[in-house]
Curated annotation (Swiss-Prot):
Name used for this protein in its record: Lysine--tRNA ligase
Pfam families: tRNA-synt_2, tRNA_anti-codon
Cofactor note as given: Binds 3 Mg(2+) ions per subunit.
Protein's UniProt keywords contain Transcription regulation: no
Cofactor or coenzyme needed: Mg(2+)
Keywords (A to Z) from UniProt: Aminoacyl-tRNA synthetase, ATP-binding, Cytoplasm, Ligase, Magnesium, Metal-binding, Nucleotide-binding, Protein biosynthesis
UniProt keyword annotation of Oxidoreductase present: no
PANTHER family hit by this protein: LYSINE--TRNA LIGASE, CHLOROPLASTIC_MITOCHONDRIAL (PTHR42918:SF15), LYSYL-TRNA SYNTHETASE (PTHR42918)
Organism: Enterobacter sp. (strain 638)
InterPro entries (UniProt xref): Aa-tRNA-synt_II, aa-tRNA-synth_II, aa-tRNA-synth_II/BPL/LPL, Lys-tRNA-ligase_II, Lys-tRNA-ligase_II_bac/euk, Lys-tRNA-ligase_II_N, Lys-tRNA-synth_II_C, NA-bd_OB-fold
Subunit structure: Homodimer.
GO CC annotation terms, alphabetical: cytosol
Length: 505
């Protein structure tokens, strides 16, 4: 047996012994009749205490005679004979407890407290004071075990090191990792900030179906499910777009939705099959209005949540305070592949030759517009580090966007990039029902030719357009990728509480 195998065996034995001991302690608690009491109430969290009292001297605290009640998980304990120091962790952070045998009811310190384990959840009451080192602490006069933890916490010095374990057992990651807790607090603040921003601009939040008879609103492979009562195959939605635009037809002129989308595709540092999007639709507006809205949204969120418009990410600093870069797709190709002749992008054969020269395998179903888009993604996308809007997307890859009035081969559409990643997609909406029907048919033809991400023909949506969709602009922003940027996270699984994982066999 190798040394590493021996260490692994020892670790299993130690864990089994620990589990056995903790279960025996719980059995003893059950005999006492109250293993999981539910009558303790706290009046402060740790962050509230630090905010209100960290600046005060010990003499001030003694004069104030502040009595508090707190509850949380015991993370550390230093027993020094008749007295101990405990670190208690709650939703707001950590607070130190000073526990003295002589200040607790008889028998509590030796017969109960000393037998409790790290990870147990405690309730404590006492008076605030500061130690000689100036640390705000609670001098306990009451201490109770509220929940017995049957499993030990991750090693206090190394935390939860295995990345996969962090995702599978997110609860342990949140207990032991301050940065992980901070990430998900920021995520919550971003969601709340978006809602505040949108409502402030007179948008109404709505909910649309998660299961759809016809998946639409994006080019992606859907998940299929079956509705037993209707005996009908249905699809988890890939986007809410077509339902949201039906609402604009119905007279709700500014709507938005924050919810999940599902796409039956690969998993990567940027992709999770189940992800969160914010989509909005605004009547009597065009894509240029949404470029302004997007800039304002990101600038506002950064300032309100992070306190600055300069957001660090790896070796870069994204500056949301400056005007965002704006390039057409062709300008971006030329900028990052200077040898490209712009005229060559207008011709199928020459565009195909460029694509193949840079390693792109051109599919038979692709037209010239799709090829140009693939060239852009290959040569330019990774270089779009600072906030950048790319405009003038080909109509071929924009089946729901309005054609440009001057050049019908392109659309009034933009995609928004930061850090070399697409964060958002917006455009002036196609409201010509006949044009939309033809583009749906083109998508059906592409699907028949082998494109399994092409859209279905949605006759009901075309019928809605025939009743009249006012001039409208729409925008979708990936919340997960936005959170990655604001938290300096480099994989999407770090910003999704429970990312998709293969089951452990």
């Amino acid at each position: 047996m190798s040394e590493q195998q021996a260490q692994g065996t020892d670790a299993v034995v130690d864990l089994n012994n620990e589990l056995k001991t903790r279960r025996e302690k719980l059995a003893a608690l059950r005999e006492q009749g109250i293993p999981f009491p539910n009558d303790f109430r706290r009046d402060h969290t740790s962050d509230q205490l630090h905010a209100d009292f960290d600046a005060k001297e010990n003499e001030e605290l003694e004069a104030l005679n502040v009595e508090v009640s707190v509850a949380g998980r015991m993370m550390t304990r230093r027993i020094m004979g008749k007295a101990s120091f405990v670190t208690l962790q709650d939703v707001g952070g950590r607070i130190q407890l000073y526990v003295s045998r002589d200040d607790l009811p008889e028998g509590i310190y030796n017969e109960q407290f000393k037998k409790w384990d790290l990870g147990d959840i405690l309730g404590a009451k006492g008076k605030l004071f500061k130690t000689k080192t100036g640390e705000l602490s609670i001098h306990c006069t009451e201490l109770r075990l509220l929940t017995k933890a049957l499993r030990p916490l991750p090693d206090k010095f190394h935390g939860l090191q295995d990345q996969e374990a962090r995702y599978r057992q997110r609860y342990l990651d949140l207990i032991s990792n301050d940065e992980s807790r901070k990430t998900f607090k920021i995520r919550s603040q971003i969601m709340a900030g978006i809602r505040q921003f949108m409502v402030g601009r007179d948008f109404m939040e709505v909910e649309t179906p998660m299961m759809q008879v016809i998946p639409g609103g994006a080019s992606a492979r859907p998940f299929v499910t079956h509705h037993n009562a209707l005996d009908l195959d249905m699809y988890l939605r890939i986007a809410p777009e077509l339902y949201l635009k039906r609402l604009v037809v119905g007279g709700f002129e500014r709507v938005f939705e924050i919810n999940r989308n599902f796409r039956n595709e690969g998993i990567s540092v940027r992709h999770n099959p189940e992800f969160t999007m914010m989509e909005l639709y605004m009547a009597y507006a065009d894509y240029k209005d949404l470029i302004e809205l997007t800039e304002s949204l990101f600038r506002t969120l950064a300032q309100n949540i992070l306190g600055t418009t300069e957001v660090p990410y790896g070796d870069e600093v994204f500056d949301f305070g400056k005007p965002f870069v704006k390039l057409t797709m062709r300008e971006a190709i030329k900028k990052y592949r200077p040898e490209t002749e712009m005229a060559d992008l207008d011709n199928y054969d020459s565009a195909k030759a460029i694509a193949e020269s840079i390693g792109i395998k051109v599919e038979k179903s692709w037209g010239q517009g799709r090829i140009v888009t693939e060239i852009f993604e290959e040569v330019a996308e990774a270089h779009l580090i600072q906030p950048t809007f790319i405009t003038e997307y080909p109509a071929e890859v924009s089946p729901l966007a309005r054609r440009n009035d001057e050049n019908p081969e392109i659309t009034d559409r933009f995609e928004f990039f930061i850090g070399g990643r697409e964060i958002g997609n917006g455009f002036s909406e196609l409201n010509d029902a006949q044009d939309q029907a033809q583009r749906f048919q083109d998508q059906v033809d592409a699907k028949a030719a082998g494109d399994d991400e092409a859209m279905f023909f949605d006759e009901d949506y075309v019928t809605a357009l025939e009743h009249g969709l006012p001039p409208t602009a729409g925008l979708g922003i990936g919340i997960d990728r936005m959170v990655m940027l604001f938290t300096n996270s480099h994989t999407i699984r770090d910003v999704i509480l429970f990312p998709a994982m293969r089951p452990v066999k």
